[in-house]
Amino acid sequence: MVCRVTRIADSFAWPFRNRPAATWAIGLLAVLVLPVGLLPLLGYAVAATRAAEQTPGDGPPRWTFSARLLADGAWAALAVLLTLLPFALLWHPLGMLLGAALDPFYAHVTAALLLALPWGMLALVHMPHATSRFAATGDPRDMLDLAGAARGVRRDFQAWNLVAAVIVTAWAVGLACAAALCVGIVPGVFYAILVSAHAAAALQRPNKDLSTR
């Protein structure tokens, strides 16, 4: 239990370890210029996961702009899109159905909120395992392997459950602190990305303190 608590706490502190200034400056810029910065940002998230797998004691890696960064970002973006697509296709029909009782605008807002929860659950099942495997192997098939991610969750549910809790908490804390400190949403988003990368890396490490195997 102590190891698990330490690992979780380490994920939350990891974004500030070692070279934080340059890493954060470029990361904040990438978030600020979204959607233009989407591919570099997602590519860096993969690179951060890879770094946390290889040297978990170090901080986030330096930004290295390369073809691999953009390619990794493109594969990660495609994986997110594939998890989102079924719910995007359901959004308008559900909004029309709810429109029988609500104003069309509020009906579509309600539909989006109703679909956000199952999409978030699917993303939590797929993205941590897929990202950790893709970061380790570099094989795009790992990034898109939803069935493999689901098997990973079933095989090591305790580890996935703790990692998912870290990711959800990081996004909640990041956005809440950004609002509370009046610094805007940009730092909170980048902080959550870094914490998520470090947490996902725990699923790939050979010596898994979180594993039940």
Tell me the role of every PLM-derived stretch.
Residues T6-L32, W63-L89, V125-A176, A202, ...:
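Interfacial aromatic "cap" segments that immediately flank transmembrane helices
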Residues D10-W14, I26-G59, A67-M121:
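Short, small/hydrophobic-residue-rich motifs at membrane-helix boundaries and re-entrant hairpins
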Residues V31-Q54, D103-D142, G174-S211:
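Selective recognition of hydrophobic, aromatic-rich stretches within alpha-helical transmembrane segments
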Residues M1-R4:
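Short, Lys/Arg-enriched N-terminal segments with co-localized hydrophobic residues
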